[in-house]
């Protein structure tokens, strides 16, 4: 029987050296949600930090799991699939929050399905779930330099930290990302897209 719980996954890499990198936007946003709703994390089978709690908005409540995979980015799907199977969570109750180089810093786009856009964490989840049909909160981090070695540039960019101006804006951006995930849960993806994609 399917669970009524939602699973909100923030993508990133575990460990102090990755904590403030662009690739950890998902972790940062899930931490914002955990802070808002007083949700505490515990270890799930060595695969993820997992928190369980309730969110309330406009008289509605929703039961949620917040997840930060500990598998490193490229194997994120293992953690998501394990939690999905263990708790019987439907695909349409999964929201994945991740960094996106195709969007400028501060922009948010919501989608379900479609291409992974070169994001290895999303590729892993698509592969493990055998489907791309879950909601995604794409959080812009801007694009790496296109000159020289594009692959090296990309790795250095996503594993690099935000500049001083962006760090000042980061709390507001993370709050927007958390708002977007909440809107998907309480109002549905279409309304959430109308609200956030046009910004």
Curated annotation (Swiss-Prot):
The record marks 99 as: Stabilizes the basic form of H active site to accept a proton. Keywords: Cytoplasm, Hydrolase, RNA-binding, tRNA-binding. Disulfide bonds: none annotated. It is found in: Cytoplasm. It catalyses: an N-acyl-L-alpha-aminoacyl-tRNA + H2O = an N-acyl-L-amino acid + a tRNA + H(+). InterPro entries: Pept_tRNA_hydro, Pept_tRNA_hydro_CS, Pept_tRNA_hydro_sf. PANTHER family: PEPTIDYL-TRNA HYDROLASE (PTHR17224:SF1). Monomer. This is Peptidyl-tRNA hydrolase. It comes from Bifidobacterium animalis subsp. lactis (strain AD011). The gene is pth.
